Swiss-Prot record:
Keyword Flavoprotein: no
Gene this protein is translated from: l(2)efl
Organism ancestry: Eukaryota, Metazoa, Ecdysozoa, Arthropoda, Hexapoda
Organism: Drosophila melanogaster
Protein name: Protein lethal(2)essential for life
Methyltransferase as UniProt keyword: no
Keywords: Developmental protein, Stress response
GO MF annotation: an example: unfolded protein binding
Amino acid sequence: MSVVPLMFRDWWDELDFPMRTSRLLDQHFGQGLKRDDLMSSVWNSRPTVLRSGYLRPWHTNSLQKQESGSTLNIDSEKFEVILDVQQFSPSEITVKVADKFVIVEGKHEEKQDEHGYVSRQFSRRYQLPSDVNPDTVTSSLSSDGLLTIKAPMKALPPPQTERLVQITQTGPSSKEDNAKKVETSTA
């Protein structure tokens, strides 16, 4: 096997994968691009095994975390969603609970900025765990545009160590009935 094809290959071939435009058209559209924004869409559409033959799973794992606009935390105490909505004013965001879902929507009409006209809209749905009471969901918006949605988990009832047993009253004493049954079975 020769090393020459690896050293003198056309490196543009590695970039000849279908571009994923969803990264470029995400919720930050209109704020300008960074160099990493363009390259991440190329790396994200590539398989994790490069032409060199090495498996590089950290490429896809780190990009999946980076592309997510929200963070979902579920533990034994709470359900929590943190969502970056800095492009929207508080009046343009709605948070509602329907059935077992939290639905977050944001929309603002066309606005003119230095690049032209921009219109943004998003909708996200998060399924509540069965341990969460939908009536306890709260939301807060920080000054830097992070929307936090929280709900506590239902508290488990404490384990009972002692239990009172009810006594039901019956007719005649069952002691006499049991004695008659024993006599007839021995005879």
